[in-house]
Amino acid sequence: MITDPISDMLTRIRNAIKVKADKVDIPASRMKIEISKILKEEGFIKSYKIIKDKKQGIIRINLKYTSEGDSVISNLQRISKPGRRVYVSKDEIPHVMGGLGVAILTTSQGVMTDKECRHKGVGGEVICYIW
């Protein structure tokens, strides 16, 4: 049984990148779909597709690589975990890798990047960092 589905998603992506896989399948949930949407908007993945099955559905993420064959994603780091939640106010939103990376937060207005949170003036729970 998976106790932290978001960590499982990030680990599956990390493992797929290590073996230079073109795509990775992840069990779907609303939160994971929102995270996939942000990864696509920020240019970390080529695309994602939701595949219906008899259970919860599957998200198929097509990974993105440079012309040299290196992954666009250098690293993914889970911040807020079930055993230790991490919340930040609008003034404490972190800059990942000096602005080169992205922090994904879940707020009262939905899942968004650190840049969107600063623009809208909202804080929330820091889900992960991606760079």
From Swiss-Prot:
Keywords: Ribonucleoprotein, Ribosomal protein, RNA-binding, rRNA-binding
Pfam families noted in UniProt: Ribosomal_S8 (PF00410)
Stated family: Belongs to the universal ribosomal protein uS8 family.
Protein name, as recorded: Small ribosomal subunit protein uS8
GO CC terms of this entry: cytosolic small ribosomal subunit
Keyword rRNA-binding appears in the UniProt entry: yes
Listed GO biological process terms: translation
Recorded coiled-coil stretches: none
